[in-house]
């Protein structure tokens, strides 16, 4: 029965794809993105939820709707589901450029489905928006890059240096089977890239109080990350005769200590540059303080760390995300544990974070265990190099009024797996978010405007041309 269902699902997919392929010129870029969003390419740590049929149907869909790209570029599938495109340039002496993306998405929680204006995998299109999981993170990027390549190939464009696209299939769960395997493949080819561009930075509006202009934040670095299980084992027993402290009590006190004593805050070079760039756009008092940063350093750090958003730019942050303990109402818990999700700022390390937690909790009953993969912070790409100039100039040409600033990305991307392949790794997508829409990323009602999606295709088209001309 399961095999029959699988065969019917595949047949349905092939029929739909055949219809799409039959009229490629009449299928707009908006409809192609909408269809791409309908493939539920969901990443989850629970491997039993993985549906290989959906992933393979999505790959087949790309081959049908971008025929020139798949005819003229060398196309390779790595580890069954991750995709590599090789666009041969005319000058073999020039170092290649690499564009990264991923087509897997996070789940839409069942408890939130009624709150969506349109189902998360419907790809619904209205007069203004395209709705669905992946419209910002990150399926839109894969589609926009392939739209750009298809457009340029129709114009008989050939880049001067080699250009690669690499699209992972498991970025949302660490990229260990996708980006990591692709990077290993590139290493066997002895590839080094002049520039790598991934997600991570974004355009923001009305996020910084007092600044009305849109700001393009290009991430020149990203934090490291790790998950730690902090656990306590204590004797069990009946709740009618409790000890002074149960395992949950001990663990709770450890959590409170960590909250009261966060990792130290400091200004890293990208954040200093960002404050210098933004200073002229703030009100008088803020502008004066930022221009005299050394004099007001403590006050600036205090102000920034008091804000939830900017606090993450100045320090390693430790978040409690999952809690376990106890199995029965009247039984004392022998075991209690909490997951600590850590985002590590440049200057800190996995080892220094572990030392901090042990020092602050200061209790031999509290044990720490590193979970799954973990990564130290990335290196920092210079904001005055060729890669930065080409990217920032392309942004400026498309959005003349925009402010452009470096950023330390608080999250992690697939780019961390490529760190040994380039000294110039930048992270940016041409999408604008404000205080409301930023909650839609991994949240409810994820969407992208039709105008902005079309502009993102134009942006990548011009960026590829500019890299070819100026690199």
Stretches with model-predicted labels:
Residues 8, 23-133, 152-161, 340:
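Acidic/His- and Gly-rich active-site-bordering loop/insert found
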Residues 76, 92, 204-205, 264-327, ...:
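An extended, acidic, His-containing surface patch that forms the Zn2+-binding/catalytic region
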Residues 129-217:
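Acidic/histidine-rich catalytic neighborhood of metal-dependent amide-processing enzymes
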């Amino acid at each position: 029965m399961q095999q029959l269902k699988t065969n019917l699902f595949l047949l349905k997919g092939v029929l739909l794809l055949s219809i799409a392929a039959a009229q490629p010129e009449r299928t707009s870029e908006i409809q192609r993105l909408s269809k791409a969003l309908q493939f539920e390419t969901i990443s989850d740590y629970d491997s039993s939820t993985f549906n290989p049929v959906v992933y393979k149907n999505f790959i087949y869909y790309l081959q049908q709707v971008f025929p020139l790209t798949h005819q003229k570029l060398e196309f390779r599938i790595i580890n069954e589901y991750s995709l590599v495109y090789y666009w041969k340039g005319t000058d073999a002496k020039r170092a290649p450029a690499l564009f990264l993306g991923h087509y897997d998405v996070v789940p839409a929680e069942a408890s939130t489905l009624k709150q969506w204006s349109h189902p998360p995998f419907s790809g619904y299109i209205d007069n203004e928006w395209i709705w669905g999981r992946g419209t910002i993170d990150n399926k839109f990027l894969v589609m926009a890059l392939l739209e750009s390549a298809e457009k340029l190939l129709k114009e008989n464009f050939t880049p001067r240096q080699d250009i690669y696209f690499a699209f992972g299939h498991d970025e949302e769960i660490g990229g260990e089977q996708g980006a990591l395997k692709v990077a290993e493949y590139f290493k066997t080819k002895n590839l080094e890239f002049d520039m790598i561009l991934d997600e991570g930075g974004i355009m923001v509006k009305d996020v910084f109080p007092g600044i009305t202009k849109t700001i393009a934040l290009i991430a020149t670095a990203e934090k490291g990350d790790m998950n730690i299980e902090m656990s306590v084992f204590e004797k069990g027993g009946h709740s009618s005769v409790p000890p002074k402290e149960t395992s949950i009590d001990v663990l709770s006190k450890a959590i409170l200590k960590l909250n009261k004593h966060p990792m130290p805050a400091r200004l890293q070079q990208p954040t200093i540059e960002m404050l210098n760039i933004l200073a002229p756009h703030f009100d008088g008092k803020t502008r004066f303080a930022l221009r005299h940063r050394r004099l007001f350093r403590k006050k600036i750090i205090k102000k920034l760390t008091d804000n939830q958003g900017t606090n993450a730019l100045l320090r390693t942050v430790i978040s409690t995300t999952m809690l376990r303990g106890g199995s029965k109402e009247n039984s004392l818990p022998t075991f209690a544990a909490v997951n600590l999700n850590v985002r590590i700022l440049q200057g800190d390390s996995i080892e220094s974070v572990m030392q901090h937690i042990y020092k602050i909790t200061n209790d031999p009953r509290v044990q720490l265990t590193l979970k799954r993969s973990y990564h130290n912070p990335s290196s920092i790409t210079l904001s005055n190099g060729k890669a930065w100039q080409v990217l920032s100039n392309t942004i400026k040409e498309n959005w003349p009024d925009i402010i452009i600033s470096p950023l330390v990305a608080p999250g992690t991307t697939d780019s961390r797996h490529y760190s040994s392949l380039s000294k110039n790794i930048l992270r940016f997508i041409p999408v604008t978010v404000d205080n409301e829409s930023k909650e839609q990323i991994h949240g409810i009602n994820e969407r992208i405007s039709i105008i902005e999606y079309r502009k993102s295709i134009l942006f990548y088209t011009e960026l590829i041309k500019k890299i070819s001309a100026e690199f």
